[in-house]
Amino acid sequence: MKGVKSLKDKQVYAVVDLETTGTDPTSDRIIQFGCVLVQDGKIIANFATDVNPNQVVPKQIQSLTGISNTQVQKAPYFEDVAHTIYHYLEDTIFVAHNVHFDYNFLARELVRCGTPPLTIPAIDTVELAQIFLPTEKSFRLSDLSESLGLSHENPHQADSDAQVTAELLLLIQEKMKSLPLVTMEKIAELSQQTARETSTFIQQTYEQMKKQVTPLNPAYQVVSGIALRKKEVPLFEETFYQTSTYPKTKKAKEKLFGERFAYRAEQSRMMNLVYDHFTEGTTKDLFIEAATGTGKTLGYLLP
């Protein structure tokens, strides 16, 4: 990662979410900042604040977030909290759901308020989810939280969004560590085009896994360098037809066939010869010469 030679054993991840008056960082402003710190597989701290944007919060943003003009009028300006936020993020890895928006918007606002440029590495949970949770139908944060059973009481509130994104990150990290090493190796090779330092995060997680190799899950097998789940074929011991005794006599054959077939003496004799040959356990070959019209096909198939 840029600015980080390797992932530390106790690396801190700053999971951030912003609510803003719009999507244009040149004219819109932050109205809510939420951050959850994650370290060693656990949430260790959180910080959230409303922010007075010094401009009107558009009605559609109020409707989406539930954040009103009255609420933010009592909040500090971003200039008042910028340095606190900057120092809170120092020496962390920035994490966000759609990292390009949150990182770039926040970095611009911090510089506007006089902090040094934000240069910490950043990873994107949208792309991590797309890679490691590929069967999900949607990668919107609200949809993922519902599908994965993550508590998300206030969607589009920065503190709630940051909290559920942190929980998503932890879930994805566990998923990564559960994968076969050869699978992680392939993913690391193919992740070069992911956002910011997401690829390096995947690569370094793979490097850590190589140092602590665990046996391959018995449910998988490696074929040509690819870990594949073993196909489980259920074995059924079930008869789908009724067994019956071979109809040796004329009467038995007529009962079996009913009116569908006409009884043929030569065909019946051929059937009995074939049946006796298979049931008597003889090692001799059986040779039968039958005239046209005898019914040879049924004569050897029925027994």
What are these regions (language model features)?
Residues 295-303:
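Motif I (Walker A/P-loop) of helicase-class P-loop NTPases
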Residues 1-122, 134-156:
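Conserved non-catalytic scaffold segment of RNase H-like nuclease domains
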Residues 157-172:
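Acidic, divalent-metal-coordinating active-site segment for phosphoryl/phosphodiester hydrolysis
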